[in-house]
Amino acid sequence: EVEIIENPSFLNSKEDLKVYFQDKKHYHQTDFYKQQRISRNILLENGKPVGGKWTFDTENRKKYPKNKKSPSISFPQNNRFYEEAKVYVSENFGNHYGELTDYQIYPTTISEAEIWLENFLENRFLEFGIYEDSIVEQEHFLHHSVLSPLMNIGFLTPNYIIEKSIEFAQKNEIPLNSLEGFIRQILGWREFIRGIYLYKGSFERTRNFWNHQRKIPKSFYDGTTGIAPIDKTIKKILKTGYAHHIERL
């Protein structure tokens, strides 16, 4: 007998998601996000959204000032896991796309992940909101948390991150547009897209809406398309494996 255990890396179980996704023809992320806020009593006052509206997205689209210095990030020290992985990747995938750096970028343990979260809250959370849509050519992370890989591999749970961020915001006067914008990425978008994956994933993966026939050219893998914004983003990904949501768009 096979027992399927729910994934703790998401807030909603498959059964939870049925409430919104099953038997619907159209899905709207904002509606889903509201339902999640209400059902979990997150950022609510007397059943209504804190600040008078559900999203502060229109306030979070500022251009990054030309002379503004981006916040510092404390990267983990190289540990034995990283050193072992470096050797393995070099020996087995040396010809693959991507750059194998001498220094460790991302956490590889739970304790490192917790430090990474604290570093975000203390150094980047304050202005996350207004600059979350900003793109700067030579900057990889800006004010973003880069917590998605840590949730995806199970180092940190979304519930833990949400609780910590709300607690920190209340104690440190974090602007509501930063707090709400950050919560929305996890509670809104991440959970919503998982629902789409579970209920429409097979359908979407087996269709070719635009009737594409040609293979993706090599230039889209090495960043030589001649289209500057695309090439710069691809090269960032080759270096760090990461691009924030606006760069991906």
Regions found by a protein language model. Give the residues of each.
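Beta-rich, aromatic/charged-enriched effector core domains that present basic-aromatic interfaces
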Residues: E1-I105
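Catalytic cores of enzymes that engage adenine nucleotides and/or redox cofactors via long glycine-rich
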Residues: N60-H245, L249
